[in-house]
Amino acid sequence: MLNIAVLVSGGGTNLQALLDSEARGENPSGKIRLVVASKPGVYALERAANAVVEGVVVRRKDYASSEDFDAALLKTLKEHNIDLVVLAGFLSVLGPSVIEAYPRRILNIHPALIPSFCGPGMYGLRPHEAALARGCKVTGATVHFVNEECDGGPILLQKAGDILPGDTPEVLQKRVMEQAEWKLLPKAVAMVCSGEIK
């Protein structure tokens, strides 16, 4: 059984999807043991507490350098014997030391169909705004392994959905979360935990 850490920065809707999937028995080869938040007071920590999962805060601004932040994060993960790291709306960039410690063991969910609307600065509503501004007819979500390139790791799963007339970035974001992200991320995590994806 793989010990999983979920890294978050906000409300934790993807975390909730993972917790719900686990509660339904959909990932018998993995267990969420730790939730790491990039700032205190985020609702994701409450979700963790409700599921009786330990939650901790590791803030980038508490450290003099990115390297010190990475070292603190890595220490936290190692202290909890974490095997798999899942970025679920985590807005801090992971440095090389963390990525090298977990080769093909860090997953990220991105709210667009990579290689479209990805890379530095493309998070939150921005990918949805960009898809609408470009006149795209479809969008979706991507789960990928994390490497040193922002949103550049190998793609594991993607799910597309239609962009409808009259969609706003907020409406599109909600639909992509409900129809793609909340389904894809638990599926990808279970596939990695079971060894189906290596």
PLM feature spans:
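Glycine/small-residue-rich loop that forms an oxyanion/phosphate-binding "nest" at active or ligand-binding sites
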Residues: 64-82
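Short, surface-exposed acidic-centric catalytic microdomains
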Residues: 28-68
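SAM-dependent methyltransferases
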Residues: 1-2, 196-198
